[in-house]
Amino acid sequence: MKEQKQSGRLTDTITPLPFKGVIFDMDGTLIVSTESDYFAWKKIFTNYGKKLSYEDYQPLLGIRSANVIKEYIGITGEEDVKRILKEKFDYFVELITANPIKPVEAAEAFLKSLQSHPVKVALATSSRKEKMQMVLQQLNFLQYFDAIVTGDEVENSKPAPDIFLKAAERLGLSAKDCMVVEDGPIGVAAAKNAKMKCVAIAETHRADKLHQADVVIDSYENADFIEICQKLASSP
């Protein structure tokens, strides 16, 4: 994670920002991982006598992996779940070793732009810690975050608000002072359940599937943080 210092960060001296913290989801929001994740899950489902089409996979996005195993594969024993989690992770590693993860277009530029504003930045991902570390180290993205929360650190997965509330807590901020950046309906619902304003990026889902978000953007290309803040602040 980035060093805890503010000396190199500019501040907004004209109009105070309506938010003190920005909380990002990871998969689909910052990194392009859906295809690799789908094929890893498809192999797991096949191994345990289940089928998984891409259409059936999409509603799983944002759900903690252990919950997918319990609720969709039907295996609930804790040791079995741990074993399958490792199998899935190993498949995922194989896939991204052959085809390295890429960032969502212009995501890094947007993260860098936040360094020009007096805001803290957190990552709140349903992914397990080992996956998060591997992917963000590969992309050199850890430097952009003041706090990180992974799916194995909270009791309830999205759409429960736990992960975003924990991220706000680690930033030392209240929920009302934080905005969330998400890419999926389940994540947007979690942000709203946390009573946080949410901007959704239409990367893995069509804009009409993200209607619960306060603001929807097509991409980070030309996305202006101040303008987004103003739109969020004026939304109902």
Predicted regions, residues:
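Asp-based, Mg2+/Mn2+-dependent phosphohydrolase catalytic module
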Residues: 2-20, 112-115, 128-236
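N-terminal helical cap/lid subdomain that shapes the substrate entry/recognition surface
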Residues: 4, 8, 15-109, 113-117, ...
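Conserved short-loop catalytic and cofactor-binding motifs
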Residues: 29, 56-57, 95-98, 120, ...
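Conserved SAM-binding loop
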Residues: 30, 103, 121-125, 156, ...
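Small/polar loops that bind or transfer phosphate-bearing groups
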Residues: 32-33, 60-61, 123-124, 182, ...
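Residue-level detector of anion-binding/catalytic polar loops
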Residues: 51, 120, 197
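Short, flexible loop segments at the rims of nucleotide/cofactor-binding pockets, characterized by
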Residues: 97-102, 126, 193-195
